[in-house]
């Protein structure tokens, strides 16, 4: 192969380009060129699936490129790689329809300043096909090899009525491309971008955001309200805040599950870290800083899904999200959270006179299953939320401890608990999503039952726990059980606010665990 041909082949792909291997695996090109000890030119690929890789970009001790995930790199020849396509080509190939703007095809007439439109064979059928696209409001382009966005107005002319678009598992590689796409889809309401690897180049992004094309398309026309970004390599929260501020100003729901996010206290937008505005006066700087606060970045956000990340600090979440005015749902399942605290008091405005926190003021649903919360005092804190009525709280250490505590309690009537479990069978089945209804393990049933008994009394306004409704009878039974377990009839001043509240509803219990224990000790003497 000649040097000229070799060069053209190497330049066929570029660094950062998203490609498919001949086995269907998807990766990003991190290197192109020679590899010592091997003939020809090679592409260094970082695969999305680490199992597809063989090394860290190192061959015989020499580092050619680096990988985020351990062992996700390998080298490939160009013959083994599949290049992406434009949005319109991938869509038209999928539906076997050729889409072109035939109205722009003309030839010059012999008469001055007159052009004659070309009449293409089959053009009427093509226009009919275009009408079908234009009528579409939902389009799934998931797994298509889309790597480029067509110039305006090609996408607009064919898909301007789209309301929902799924571009998950494609080959797009930058947020600049997404800006270019959104300008042509003014009616888009819901966008899926899962399992893409979108880079963020500040200069390119700003240039595309601030530009209007000859057809008048602007990013201000974007109307996306629901954004799904599962496993999209968005661990940097500054990027999240920047794209939402400039692209998704009307966003109501964001799913950022499985992005390796560790903290979310970096709300300052990347775009304001440059020095373009060095001459701004002090008032303008203060105003700009205020606009970086969460309530300004996400004024319409109602639902945020941060499940399956590595978040450890609830305080980070509180300081960053606690003042969002519209937030009603927060999913923190499968993280590393160990505690829950609400800062401040009545004097600093963070708490109301009734002891409720003014943070997360409109939060109705919070999901905290599969975290590392190991003390009931942190769960008690959730009762300070003004609007909370639904909670998910499975598989935390404090829940697992219930069964151990119960098994060591000599005063526990085992048969009574078994009967209660049988009587509450419907709630138990709902709590397990109706899976394996007739084959539940007794240990799991008991854990679920004890979990509900210990959580429901602590959260007075809770209406749903672990996807199961809380009935009035269940709440009464749970609160009476809670009084039996925790009420101090000997020294009533040691009873906390929650116990005194339950006493005001149900009255002072005749028998408690403490009184029965004392009676047993007296009888023993």
From Swiss-Prot:
One of its GO terms (biological process) is microtubule cytoskeleton organization. InterPro entries: CAP-Gly_dom_sf, CAP-Gly_domain, Leu-rich_rpt, Leu-rich_rpt_4, Leu-rich_rpt_typical-subtyp, LRR_dom_sf. The keyword Ion transport does not apply. Residues 33-77 form the CAP-Gly domain. SUPFAM superfamilies: Cap-Gly domain (SSF74924), RNI-like (SSF52047). LRR repeats lie at residues 300-321, 326-347, 362-383. It is found in: Cytoplasm; Cytoplasm, Cytoskeleton. One of its GO terms (cellular component) is cytoskeleton. Keywords: Chaperone, Cytoplasm, Cytoskeleton, Leucine-rich repeat, Repeat. The keyword Mitochondrion does not apply. Residues 422-444 have a biased composition (Low complexity). Gene3D superfamilies: CAP Gly-rich-like domain (2.30.30.190), Ribonuclease Inhibitor (3.80.10.10). GO terms for molecular function: alpha-tubulin binding. It holds the Pfam family CAP_GLY. Residues 441-481 form the LRRCT domain. Residues 414-444 are annotated as: Disordered. It comes from the Eukaryota. Belongs to the TBCE family. Supercomplex made of cofactors A to E. Cofactors A and D function by capturing and stabilizing tubulin in a quasi-native conformation. Cofactor E binds to the cofactor D-tubulin complex; interaction with cofactor C then causes the release of tubulin polypeptides that are committed to the native state. Tubulin-folding protein; involved in the second step of the tubulin folding pathway. This is Tubulin-specific chaperone E. It comes from Dictyostelium discoideum (Social amoeba). The gene is tbce.
């Amino acid at each position: 192969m000649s040097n000229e041909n070799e060069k053209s082949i190497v330049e066929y792909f570029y660094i950062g380009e998203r490609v498919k291997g001949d086995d269907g695996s998807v990766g990003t090109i991190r290197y192109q060129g020679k590899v010592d000890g091997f003939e020809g030119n090679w592409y260094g690929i970082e695969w999305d699936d680490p199992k597809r890789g063989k090394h860290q970009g190192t061959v015989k001790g020499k580092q050619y490129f680096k990988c985020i995930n351990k062992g996700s790199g390998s080298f490939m020849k160009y013959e083994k790689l599949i290049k992406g396509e434009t949005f319109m080509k991938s869509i038209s190939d999928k539906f076997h329809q050729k889409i072109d703007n035939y109205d722009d095809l003309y030839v010059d007439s012999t008469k001055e300043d007159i052009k004659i439109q070309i009449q293409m064979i089959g053009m009427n059928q093509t226009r009919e096909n275009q009408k079908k696209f234009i009528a579409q409001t939902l389009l799934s382009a998931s797994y298509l090899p889309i790597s480029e966005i067509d110039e305006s107005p090609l996408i607009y002319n064919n898909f301007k009525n789209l309301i929902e678009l799924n571009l998950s598992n494609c080959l797009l590689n930058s947020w600049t491309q997404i800006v270019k796409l959104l300008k042509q889809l003014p009616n888009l309401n819901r966008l899926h971008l899962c399992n893409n690897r979108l880079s963020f180049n500040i200069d390119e992004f700003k240039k595309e955001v601030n530009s209007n094309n000859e057809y008048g398309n602007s990013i201000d026309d974007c109307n996306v309200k629901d954004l799904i970004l599962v496993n999209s390599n968005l661990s940097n929260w500054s990027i999240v805040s920047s794209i939402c501020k400039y692209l998704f100003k009307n966003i109501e729901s964001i799913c950022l599950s499985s992005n390796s996010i560790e903290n979310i206290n970096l709300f300052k937008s990347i775009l304001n870290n440059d020095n373009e505005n060095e001459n701004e006066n002090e008032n303008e700087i203060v105003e700009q800083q205020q606009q970086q606060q969460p309530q300004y970045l996400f004024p319409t956000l109602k639902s945020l899904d941060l499940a399956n990340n590595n978040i450890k600090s609830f305080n980070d979440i509180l300081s960053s999200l606690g003042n969002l005015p519209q937030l009603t749902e927060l999913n923190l399942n499968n993280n590393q959270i160990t505690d829950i605290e609400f800062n401040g008091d009545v004097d600093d405005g963070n708490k109301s006179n009734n002891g409720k926190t003014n943070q997360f003021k409109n939060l109705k649903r919070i999901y905290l299953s599969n975290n590392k919360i190991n003390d009931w005092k942190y769960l008690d804190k959730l009762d300070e939320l003004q609007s909370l009525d639904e909670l998910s709280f499975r598989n935390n250490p404090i829940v697992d401890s219930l069964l151990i505590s119960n098994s060591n309690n000599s005063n526990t009537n085992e048969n009574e608990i078994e009967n209660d479990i049988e009587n509450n069978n419907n709630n138990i089945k709902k709590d397990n999503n109706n899976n394996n209804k007739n084959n539940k393990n007794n240990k799991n049933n008991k854990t679920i039952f004890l979990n509900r008994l210990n959580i429901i009394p602590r959260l007075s306004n809770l209406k749903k726990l672990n996807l199961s409704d809380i009935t009035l009878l269940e709440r009464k039974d749970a609160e009476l059980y809670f009084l039996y377990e925790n009420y101090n009839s000997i020294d009533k001043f040691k009873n906390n606010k929650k116990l005194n509240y339950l006493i005001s509803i149900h009255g002072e219990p005749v028998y408690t665990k403490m009184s029965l224990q004392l009676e047993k000790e007296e009888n023993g003497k």
